[in-house]
Structures are given as C-alpha cells and as structure tokens.
C-alpha cells in the first residue's frame, strides 16, 4: 500500500464519522439498516450474541452471503476476518469488500501477529482497549479504530472503559514535554512518529468509533459524549423487539447526542431491548483477544 493509498483509506473512514455501522446477517436486515440511516453495514453469518452463545470456532463468513448483502444495499459493506488470518483478508479484498474488520469477535487465527494491513488496498478496521493497542494497529495499517467492548452482551460498560482509558492516555500524552514523548512511545510500545502525532494533535490519526454492548439510543449518545466519532451496533438491533424502529432511533441519537429532549422521544416505545448479559456474569472472552 502506497502512502497515498494509506491517506485515501483514512479519509474514506473519516466519511463515516458521526454515523452508525450495524451488524446484519441477511440482505433483508441490510435493507432495514440502510433505510434506518446506517452509514455502513457489517455482514456476518451470526451476530456476536449468537457467536458467544454457540461457542466453538468462529470464522470468516461465506463470501456468497456477503455478496448477497453487497448487492442488496448501496451503502458500504464491511466484513470480519480472524485476527492474523491473511488468506481470509485476501478473499474479502478479492470480492471487493469496502472495509475489513480484523475482529476479536471471531476466533483468532494467530495469537502473536496481526495482519500486515499495509499489504492491502482495502481499508481495515481494528479494535483497541487502550492507546497502545490503537497505535500498534495503526502502525500495521489500520484506517479506523473502534473500542473492543465485550461483544454480544448488550452491556456497554467495557466500551465505556476502553473509550475513557484511550482518551485519558491521549490527554496524558498531550501534556508531556516534547523530549518526554520518546519515553512515552517506548512505554506504549508504539512508533515514535505516531506518539508524536497524538502529542501534537490531541487525537488518533484515524477515526475512533465505539463498539461492544451498545443496545439503546442512550448508549449510543453516551459513547458520543465520551468522545466516540461514531458507533458500531451489533446484537442490540436485531435481537430487540422492533429492529427497524430501534435502528432509526440509534442513528438519530448518534447524530443528535447533545439533544436530551430528542433522546427522550427517541427512547419511547422501542419495543423490548435485547436481554443482554451483565459483565459480572461472564468471563471476558473477546475483548482480551489480540493486544
């Protein structure tokens, strides 16, 4: 990937800012997401809640199923590959997917190395729990970062924790003297030029979305309040009582997160939310993958 291509990919991801990306498993769901105002959809065979419930090994989705979703909608389509699985990423690039998510939701293929995303033309999305993880993924070529949260739970606490941690570490880096950034880069285990960028600009060099446990318009507004530049919603929509209404409400809440009166209206009569799993009831399985 040339420097120009890397810049283009980052700018492509910037265009999703302020939007909602929804997990979908069928062309029908993709159309519901598009009609609700989603800025992109994530095509996968099983949503995270079902992956968590079923256990076993979770892999890249069938390309035929992904193509069906690509044909059904005009908005960008993303798909997930296992951490470190270069061949799955090549397959998705071959079918002209718009973005690849190297995702901890699927079973990791490599417990040491992530994909060298600089070898690909397609932009990559990666998860991160803290600033060090985010900058390492960006060094590998990621064009977009999202919090890991704990997918499939409907419990937003981990996404909140990861976003707060990342932004706290950014503020700490900004407050350093120029000559202290070298040591900070060493402690974070990241390239100096990326640490210096954060120090100078007070933000990541790529967009940073919230993901993991977002299930209500209020959850989406909370993540925007905490500094997210957009939101991924996985199980929270199509595991709920009225997916179309909830999807549209979350899109509007993300765009108007400071308008409490509108948020109150959007939260009314949405049908039953996904049941969810409290963080204390589970082992953290997915968020810890791929550091």
Swiss-Prot record:
Its EC number is 4.3.3.6. The active site is at 80 (schiff-base intermediate with d-ribose 5-phosphate). Pfam families: SOR_SNZ. PROSITE patterns: PDXS_SNZ_1 (PS01235), PDXS_SNZ_2 (PS51129). Keywords: Lyase, Pyridoxal phosphate, Schiff base. D-ribose 5-phosphate binds at residues 23, 152, 213, 234-235. GO terms for biological process: amino acid metabolic process; pyridoxal phosphate biosynthetic process; pyridoxine biosynthetic process. HAMAP family: PdxS (MF_01824). This is Pyridoxal 5'-phosphate synthase subunit PdxS. The gene is pdxS.
């Amino acid at each position: 990937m040339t420097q120009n291509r890397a810049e283009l990919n980052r700018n492509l991801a910037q265009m999703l800012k302020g939007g909602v990306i929804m997990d979908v498993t069928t062309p029908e769901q993709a159309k519901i997401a598009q009609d609700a105002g989603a800025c992109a959809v994530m095509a996968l065979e099983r949503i995270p809640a079902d992956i968590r419930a079923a256990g076993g090994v979770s892999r890249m989705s069938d390309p035929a199923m992904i193509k069906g979703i690509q044909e059904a909608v005009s908005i960008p389509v993303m798909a997930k590959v296992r951490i470190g699985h270069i061949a799955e990423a090549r397959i998705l690039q071959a079918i002209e997917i718009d973005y690849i998510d190297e995702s901890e939701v699927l079973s990791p293929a490599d417990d040491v190395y992530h994909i060298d995303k600089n070898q690909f033309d397609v932009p990559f999305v990666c998860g991160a729990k803290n600033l060090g993880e985010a900058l390492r993924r960006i060094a590998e070529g990621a064009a977009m970062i999202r919090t890991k949260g704990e997918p499939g739970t409907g419990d937003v606490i981990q996404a909140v924790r990861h976003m707060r941690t990342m932004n706290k570490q950014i503020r700490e880096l900004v407050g350093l003297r120029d000559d202290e950034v070298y040591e900070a880069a060493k402690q974070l285990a990241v390239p100096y030029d990326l640490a210096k960028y954060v120090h100078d600009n007070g933000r990541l060099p790529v967009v940073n979305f919230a993901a993991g446990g977002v299930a209500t318009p209020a959850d989406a507004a909370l993540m925007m309040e905490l500094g997210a530049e957009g939101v991924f919603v996985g199980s929270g929509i199509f595991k709920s009582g009225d997916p179309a209404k909830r999807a549209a409400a979350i899109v509007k809440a993300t765009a108007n997160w400071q308008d409490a009166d509108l948020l109150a209206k959007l939260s009314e009569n949405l049908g039953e939310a996904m049941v969810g799993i409290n963080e204390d009831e589970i082992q953290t399985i997915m968020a810890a993958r791929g550091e």
